[in-house]
């Protein structure tokens, strides 16, 4: 019997999944999901425990002419839907594509995290006060409480978008 390569199209029946089957060809791609908690812990360490790091400010002249718009929150949130949607779709519908996407994410997000540890960056683009008081500006203010303006280059949003393509 010919051995199948990981790229062979296998449609897993997730109803049959048991932990003892995690190393089988049908379900081994599930282990790639372990990257997300590991990345989350590494990013948390970067964001919360490097409070006194010397950050390199990322800035260009174009930054000075782009006005703040609370409406930008909507495409920002849709980016998460885009990335999670692409991962979910490929996980259930196209396992070889899921494996490729996750390998790309693992390599590039890990490389970005190493860069952040070695060369911390930040942007100083946030307004001191919002021009309007509405639901979107309150949501942006809430996001600012946990989504810092640090570790911005290389951009995980750009990397994630490329992965989802």
Predicted regions and their residues:
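Membrane-interface loops
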Residues: 50-63, 91-165
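N-terminal transmembrane-helix/juxtamembrane module of multi-pass inner/ER membrane proteins
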Residues: 2-83, 128-131, 140
């Amino acid at each position: 019997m010919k051995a199948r390569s990981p790229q062979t199209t296998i449609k897993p029946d997730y109803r049959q999944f048991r932990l003892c089957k995690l190393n089988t060809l049908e379900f081994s791609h599930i282990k790639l999901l372990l990257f997300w908690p590991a990345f989350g812990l590494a990013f948390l360490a970067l964001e919360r425990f490097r409070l006194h790091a010397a950050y390199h400010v990322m800035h260009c002249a174009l930054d000075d002419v782009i006005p703040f718009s609370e409406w930008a929150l909507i495409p920002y949130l849709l980016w998460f839907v885009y990335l999670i949607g692409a991962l979910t779709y490929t996980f259930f519908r196209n396992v070889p594509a899921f494996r490729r996407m996750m390998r790309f994410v693992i390599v590039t997000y890990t490389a970005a995290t190493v860069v952040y540890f070695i060369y911390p960056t930040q942007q100083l683009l946030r307004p001191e006060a919002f021009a309007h008081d509405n639901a979107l500006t309150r949501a942006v203010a809430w996001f600012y409480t946990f989504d810092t303006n640090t570790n911005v280059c290389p951009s995980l949003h750009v990397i994630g978008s490329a992965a989802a393509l």
